[in-house]
Amino acid sequence: MQIRRLALHQLRRFNAVELSPQPGLNLLTGDNGAGKTSILEALHLMAYGRSFRGRVRDGLVRQGQEALEIFVEWDEQRASHPPHRRKAGLRHSGQDWKGRLDGEDVAQLGNLCAALAVVTFEPGSHALVSGGGEPRRRFLDWGLFHVEPDFLSLWRRYSRALKQRNALLKQGGPSRMLDTWDHELAEAGEPLTSRRQHYLERLQQRTVALAAELAPQLGIQAMELSPGWRRHELPLADALLLARERDRQAGYTSVGPHRADWSVDFHNIPGRDALSRGQAKLTALACLLAQAEDYAEQRGEWPVIALDDLASELDRTHQARVLERLLGGPAQIFVTATETPAALQELTHIARFHVEHAQIVAVP
């Protein structure tokens, strides 16, 4: 997957700018606040439907403007297939959005996000390891969404049933109606959990190997799924029935895949609460790169890799290891920094851009 053109309109500091990145590594430098991160933010918004720095309506649209617009043109380069040029556009006001993909309107944002895959490492990525369960569930589901075509319909089926059951619990609905939605939750939730389990097992092998190469001092040894109920003791249908009275009192569903989580086990660190911020960042990066490698194996092409403010997130040794690993493969990479990272100073085969005064200038 190679981005050929990125155009931004009314996004944060930018009025209208355009970037024509190259295959391989693209380095964007500039002072703090110049807008480097906003470029990666635009890619992330197209790939995930949200920014990694908050909601669209919280400052992403340029002040005084009604909506932002993003246009991306890229080549799909799957194995044994010739490159295929694709185009996507998004207009977002913070409340409403309109998207187009390959010349056609899209009815659901998920359809737009399914087209462009971006794996992003940014200053908040440590939350993947040290934060709450929601980002970890999203991490699993994003990967499955891209490598298993029917996963989205399964996830939507579960989400709809959960919404209906929660509404009934709040309204004090009759047991016969709860029986119906318990059955639907179990029918979708059991296979959804099996997918998550198998995916995490696959990622575990890659994450352990990557961490041993990039940050051997971490001693990552395993990744373990907590499915959201005592799955080793009883099926989800029984867990929902047993929790029904408690759920009636609480007004929401307390067991199921929406309560799932996963953790990383270390040789010499007792758990995530004992991790330093630096250790959490390195662990998160290993997980993200493992996800990118798995995507590449399953789909036959690499996702775009975006590394925001790499020099301030990792020390020089770890920067060098990460960049050496990535530069040895075919991925298109975007790196932002206030100045050229030491690991890149001697390289000549990278594309360089400077961001200043809300403009992007290619550096010869």
From Swiss-Prot:
ATP binds at G30, D31, N32, G33, A34, G35, K36, T37. One of its GO terms (biological process) is SOS response. Keywords: ATP-binding, Cytoplasm, DNA damage, DNA repair, DNA replication, DNA-binding, Nucleotide-binding, SOS response. Its main location: cytoplasm. It is found in: Cytoplasm. It comes from the Bacteria. GO terms for cellular component: cytoplasm. GO terms for molecular function: ATP binding; single-stranded DNA binding. The keyword DNA repair applies. The keyword Lipid metabolism does not apply. The RecF protein is involved in DNA metabolism; it is required for DNA replication and normal SOS inducibility. RecF binds preferentially to single-stranded, linear DNA. It also seems to bind ATP. Belongs to the RecF family. HAMAP family: RecF. NCBIfam families: recf (TIGR00611). PANTHER family: DNA REPLICATION AND REPAIR PROTEIN RECF. This is DNA replication and repair protein RecF. It comes from Stenotrophomonas maltophilia (strain R551-3).
